[in-house]
Amino acid sequence: MRAYDIVIIGGGPAGLAAAISAKKSGVDSVLILERDKELGGILNQCIHNGFGLHTFKEELTGPEYAGRFIDQAKELNIEYKLNTMVMDISPQKVVTAMNREEGLFEIQAKAVVLAMGCRERSRGALNIPGYRPAGIFSAGTAQRLVNIEGYMPGREVVILGSGDIGLIMARRMTFEGAKVKVVAELMPYSGGLKRNIVQCLDDYDI
């Protein structure tokens, strides 16, 4: 069983930042376990700009922002495993994981950092009624389909909710040639930033 000082579960921005910080602080062996096929996490599908202003003092897209962390991690020779799913963490900090190359394996860690990121609520948790789910997507799923998979989920779009991701997807779908019929909001005000309301809705007459 291989041993590491720190095992970080999740290779998104939080996991990468934790690994870089640990390595710069003098920790000898750091390992990142990422279930996706590349590092970067949710940032890989966020191709709009607005990232990096505080950390790098410049405006970057999500993939550019992730790339800065990935470059630093590689410069520091931080180990990582992709397409790897963590199955269990024991009280003794033994991490059980699996991937196609190694099968099921165990890693002994002195410390474990959980940096798995967040997930959207499911269709059921969102209380979307009906029994025909075809054509109904969460904003994050639609974003991944368009920006990463290259799949257009629809040509006539109604967006429920005016949070930032909904506003950004209204603009993105418009860029791809879809007709965004309406962005519907239950509250009397938008949940998104004023900047996104102007740049994503007003500028495109949505």
What do these predicted ranges mean?
Residues 1-206:
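Residues forming the flavin
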